[in-house]
Amino acid sequence: NPASLLMDMLNIGREAAYRRLRGEVPFTFGEASALCARMHFSLDRVVGLAATDKLSFQLKFKEFTAPLETYNEILERDIAFMREVASDPTTEFATATNSLPAEFYGKYDNLNRFKLFKWLYQHEVGNPAVRTFEELKLPAELQRNCREYVRWVQSVATTYLIFDDSNFKHWLNALRAYREMHLISQESVRVLRDELFAMLDEMETVAVKGEFENGNKIFLYLSDIDLESSYSYVTTSRHQAVNIGMFSLNGLRTPDPLMYEYVKKWIKTQSR
């Protein structure tokens, strides 16, 4: 119901919502901006100001002064978004990636911690006193949100995941390199190895069954062609968006319909 949608998003009464729908009362700029943000469409395109040869992307990370806190805030926004789209039975989420996705490793505490340690080390950000993997302690809230994100991603009705053969190779190469630099102990390597095997068993199970533990559908594919980055899209009955991965945990996002169609087509071709 459009009126109910406006009432919920704009916090207005039913009669006020119907007056806006009938054109009797114009939307304020603030109301229009709020609708754009919630429904993921471009206000520039609505009013005809958008240049047809330019696209707008939003970078997930802009500040690195408090990286773990920033990452936790982004996780909370992602959880809220996935919770919203998971309520739509038509929602489709797809990823083509050359690295193991958070949709799987996020529920494994040590794998998740190693991914964040690698990211902090590569960008030379975070606490300079944290010199080794063992010294990195993740806040309990961040660990909880990582697992919560996995839960809500797997709550989407249909998921497509496409990997190339470098997924595990990237993790093994990083483990080997950090071990040689004495940034991680042999015992931690064994713990991470065990979690990698557990995750592989989980992936094999869902691949055979074609569904997560909650019964939602998942289709896993292996690409014979190397994937140069990570690409994903989400589509529901109301909106759509894409994400292009960069800098390990960062990404460029846009709800642009042309880019959505391009990324969706590209991902679909990788599953052939």
Language-model-detected regions and their locations in the chain:
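Glycine-rich loops and low-complexity Gly/Arg-rich segments
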Residues: 44, 82-84, 259-260
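Charged/polar, solvent-exposed surface patches and flexible loops
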Residues: 4, 8, 19, 37, ...
